[in-house]
């Protein structure tokens, strides 16, 4: 198991209250031995003018889930910060809920790399993202 911090999904959601994460209604929803999932609705908060899920908000979901996963893989005297994120938007989504799953590609002492897959309710891949995090130490 990769998790060094034993946060429950409820605790992760409480940490996110009164932030951009809660404004977008992102909810941490499931966790496995080496993955973390979150959901986000496709509604008036998350669509662009043409009525599809806004690509920037897919990236916000990817960075949210990847950063929380990274945070749970470090010790109490460490922190993570995003260095780079990219995303390939593969399929438009018009309504419903999307689910993001973050899995680690690399968990090093100074950097982490996470792959995030965002799927629609038909389990079709809509966005594929990669997030690189810097791992720092509190002094």
Swiss-Prot record:
One example GO MF annotation: 1,4-dihydroxy-2-naphthoyl-CoA thioesterase activity
InterPro entries reported in the protein's UniProt record: HotDog_dom_sf, PAAI_dom, Thioestr_dom
Disulfide bonds: none
EC numbers on record: 3.1.2.-
Any single Pfam family the record assigns to this protein: 4HBT
Source superkingdom: Bacteria
Classification via SUPFAM superfamilies: Thioesterase/thiol ester dehydrase-isomerase
Signal peptide range in chain numbering: none
Keywords annotated in UniProt: Hydrolase
GO cellular component term of the entry, any: cytosol
NCBIfam families named in the record: unchar_dom_1
Family recorded in the similarity comment: Belongs to the thioesterase PaaI family.
Name of the molecule in the record: Putative esterase PM0788
Species in which this protein is naturally found: Pasteurella multocida (strain Pm70)
């Amino acid at each position: 198991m990769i998790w060094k911090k034993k946060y429950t999904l409820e605790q992760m959601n409480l940490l996110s209250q009164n932030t951009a994460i809660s404004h977008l209604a992102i909810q941490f929803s499931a966790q496995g031995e080496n993955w973390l999932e979150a959901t986000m609705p496709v509604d008036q908060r998350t669509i662009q003018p043409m009525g599809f899920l806004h690509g920037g908000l897919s990236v916000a979901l990817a960075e949210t889930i990847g950063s929380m996963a990274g945070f749970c893989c470090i010790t109490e005297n460490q922190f993570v910060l995003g260095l780079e994120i990219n995303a390939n938007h593969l399929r438009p989504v018009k309504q419903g809920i999307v689910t993001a799953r973050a899995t680690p590609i690399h968990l090093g002492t100074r950097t982490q790399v996470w792959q995030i897959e965002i799927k629609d309710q038909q389990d079709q891949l809509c966005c594929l993202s990669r997030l690189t995090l810097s791992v720092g130490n509190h002094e």
